[in-house]
Regions:
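Membrane-interface helix-start motif
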Residues: 1-18
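Cytosolic-side ends of inner-membrane transmembrane helices, especially those
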Residues: 20-38
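Membrane-proximal alpha-helical signal-transduction linkers
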Residues: 32-56, 65, 72
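The cytosolic transmitter module of two-component sensor histidine kinases
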Residues: 57-64, 136, 177, 216
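Conserved long alpha-helical elements within nucleotide-processing catalytic cores of c-di-GMP signaling
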Residues: 80-87, 96-115, 122-152, 158-162, ...
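Cyclic nucleotide signaling catalytic output domains
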Residues: 157, 204-212, 218-233, 239-242
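Catalytic core regions of nucleotide second-messenger enzymes
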Residues: 159-160, 175-177, 188-204, 231, ...
Length: 242
C-alpha cells in the first residue's frame, strides 16, 4: 500500500509538472507571437507596401525597426533629390525638357483645355558673345524667375533649350484670350524694364490654346508659328495663334 501511494504521488507530480510545462509552452508561444511573430508579420507587410516599419514587439525588434526606419527615411529623401534633379533644369530649377516631353502629351490627351506659351530670349547669342557666358546664365535665370512670377503656381514652367522656355497654363480656354494677352504684354514689359546689371533683354512669345478654333497643325507647331511671326516682325513682343 505504501509503495502504491508513493507511486501515485510521483505520478501526480509528473502529471502536474507536464501540465505546468504545457502551460509554460503555451505562454511562451503567446509571448513569442506577440513580441516576435506578430511584429515580424507587420514588418514584412510594411516593406511590401513601401511604408515605414511599426515600432513594436521585443526591444531588439523595436531597435531594428528604428534603424530600418531611419535608413528608409534617408533613402526616401535621396530618391526625392534624385527625382528632382532628373526633372529640373540645374541652372534655373524650372522643369526640364524631359519633363516637358512627359507632361505635354498627357495634357494633350486630356479633356481639360489649356494654353501653351513658348518664350525665346531675343539676341541671346550676342549677349553670350559680347558679355560672356556668365551674363548669359544670369539672363536665363532672370527670365526663369520672371516666368515663375508671371504665371500661376498650378501652371508648368519649363526650360526646354538654351534660351527657350515653355509654359503650360492648365485649365485655360480660348475664352480667356484677352486676359492671356494682357498677361503676356505685362511679361514682355517686365522683362524689358528689368535689365539692371545686364545688357538690355527682351523676349519673343508665341502662344496657342488647345481648343483654338482653326488649328493649322499640332498645338506645339501652332504656338511655334505664333512665336516665329513675332520674331519676323521685330521681336520683343507676343502673339497668340488664331
Amino acid at each position: 500500500g505504501h509503495a502504491s501511494s508513493v507511486f501515485r504521488d510521483v505520478y501526480r507530480k509528473q502529471e502536474l509538472g507536464l501540465t505546468l510545462l504545457v502551460i509554460l509552452l503555451l505562454i511562451n508561444s503567446l509571448v513569442m507571437h506577440k513580441l516576435v511573430v506578430k511584429p515580424l508579420v507587420h514588418y514584412i507587410a510594411s516593406v511590401h507596401r513601401g511604408d515605414p516599419m511599426p515600432v513594436e514587439g521585443a526591444l531588439e525588434l523595436q531597435s531594428l525597426a528604428e534603424i530600418c526606419n531611419a535608413a528608409f527615411e534617408e533613402t526616401q529623401e535621396t530618391q526625392k533629390i534624385i527625382r528632382h534633379e532628373a526633372e529640373h533644369d540645374p541652372l534655373t530649377d524650372l522643369l526640364n525638357r524631359g519633363s516637358f516631353n512627359r507632361i505635354f502629351p498627357i495634357c494633350c490627351q486630356g479633356k481639360t483645355p489649356f494654353a501653351l506659351v513658348l518664350v525665346d530670349i531675343d539676341h541671346f547669342k550676342s549677349i553670350n558673345d559680347t558679355c560672356g557666358h556668365t551674363a548669359g546664365d544670369e539672363a536665363i535665370k532672370r527670365i526663369a524667375s520672371q516666368l515663375k512670377s508671371a504665371f500661376r503656381s498650378e501652371d508648368y514652367t519649363f526650360r526646354i533649350g538654351g534660351d527657350e522656355f515653355a509654359v503650360i497654363m492648365v485649365d485655360v480656354s480660348e475664352a480667356l484670350r484677352e486676359p492671356l494677352e494682357e498677361r503676356l504684354r505685362l511679361l514682355c514689359d517686365t522683362v524689358a524694364g528689368s535689365s539692371t546689371g545686364l545688357p538690355p533683354i527682351s523676349i519673343s512669345v508665341g502662344a496657342a490654346f488647345s481648343d483654338r478654333r482653326n488649328p493649322e497643325s499640332t498645338l506645339f507647331n501652332d504656338a511655334d508659328k505664333a512665336l516665329y511671326d513675332v520674331k519676323e516682325h521685330g521681336k520683343a513682343s507676343y502673339r497668340i495663334f488664331g
